[in-house]
C-alpha cells in the first residue's frame, strides 16, 4: 500500500491549522573583496600572528583597518605590507595595559579615518608566560592586564562609542581553546575571563544591534607560541 496519499492528507490538515506567510528573498552574489567593503575595523595586536592574519583577511575583503601594537617598527612593517590592498590601513602604538591612554588613542583613531564610523573591534592582543608553579607575580599581572583587563576596557570604550552614535556593528574577542579546559596558568585564566566577558557583552549589547562573538583557536604557529 502506498503511504504517500495518507501522508499528504495529514500534512494538508496540519498546515490548514496554521497561517502561512510567504517571504520573497532576493539573493545576490558578493565577491570576496566586497564582504566587508566600506567598513572600518580596529584589530589589537595586529602586527603578527593571528592578529595580522585577521587584518590581512579583512583588507582582502574590502575592510579598512586600524591595527595596534607595542612596537612602532613592527607596526610600520605590518602597515606597509597591508597597504598593498586597495583599502585604508593605519597603525597606532597601544599598550593594552595602559588603560588611561585608551580614550585619547581612540579619539586619534577616529581622526585618522576622518570621522567615518568604526564598526568592528577585534580584541586580539595577548601575551603568555610560564604556567604554574613557575609564574612570577609580575608575569601574572602582565598577562591578566594585557589579555583580560585591556579587552574589558577597550570593549567598554568601543561599546559606548557605538551605542552613543547608533552604530550597529561587531566585537570579536579572541580567546583560546585552553579557555575550555581547567586553568593552571595566568594565560588560561585570562582566556576564561574573555570567554565570560564575551557572553556578558553579547547579552548586554544585543539590544543596540551590536553582535559580540568569540573564537577559541587551538595551538597556532604564531611567534608567541614559538617562543
Please give the residue ranges for each predicted region.
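Conserved glycine-rich cofactor-binding loop
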Residues: 40, 47-48
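Non-catalytic terminal and boundary segments that flank Rossmann-like NAD(P)-dependent oxidoreductase
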Residues: 1-40
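Alpha-helical segment proximal to the catalytic Tyr-Lys
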Residues: 160, 164, 203-207
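Conserved NAD(P)H cofactor-binding loop of Rossmann-fold oxidoreductase domains
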Residues: 124-129
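Residue(s) in the substrate-gating loop at a strand-loop-helix junction
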Residues: 176
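Substrate-binding pocket helix/loop in short-chain dehydrogenase/reductase
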Residues: 131-144
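Active-site helix of classical SDR
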Residues: 155, 190, 198
Amino acid at each position: 500500500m502506498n503511504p504517500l496519499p495518507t501522508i499528504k492528507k495529514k500534512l494538508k490538515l496540519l498546515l490548514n491549522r496554521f497561517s502561512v506567510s510567504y517571504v520573497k528573498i532576493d539573493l545576490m552574489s558578493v565577491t570576496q573583496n566586497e564582504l566587508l567593503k566600506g567598513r572600518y575595523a580596529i584589530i589589537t595586536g595586529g602586527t603578527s600572528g593571528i592578529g595580522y592574519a585577521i587584518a590581512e583577511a579583512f583588507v582582502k575583503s574590502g575592510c579598512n583597518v586600524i591595527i595596534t601594537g607595542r612596537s612602532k617598527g613592527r607596526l610600520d612593517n605590518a602597515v606597509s605590507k597591508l597597504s598593498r590592498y586597495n583599502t585604508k590601513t593605519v597603525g597606532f602604538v597601544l599598550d593594552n595595559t595602559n588603560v588611561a591612554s585608551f580614550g585619547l588613542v581612540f579619539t586619534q583613531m577616529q581622526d585618522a579615518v576622518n570621522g567615518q564610523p568604526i564598526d568592528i573591534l577585534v580584541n586580539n592582543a595577548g601575551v603568555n608566560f610560564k604556567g604554574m608553579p613557575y609564574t612570577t607575580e609580575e608575569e601574572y599581572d602582565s598577562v591578566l592586564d594585557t589579555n583580560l583587563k585591556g579587552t574589558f576596557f577597550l570593549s567598554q570604550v568601543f561599546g559606548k562609542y557605538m551605542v552613543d552614535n547608533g552604530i550597529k556593528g561587531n566585537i570579536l574577542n579572541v580567546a583560546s581553546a585552553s579557555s575550555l579546559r581547567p586553568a593552571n596558568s595566568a594565560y588560561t585564566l585570562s582566556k576564561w575571563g574573555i570567554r565570560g566577558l564575551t557572553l556578558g557583552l553579547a547579552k548586554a549589547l544585543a539590544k543596540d544591534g551590536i553582535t559580540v562573538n568569540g573564537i577559541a583557536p587551538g595551538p597556532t604557529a604564531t611567534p608567541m607560541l614559538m617562543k
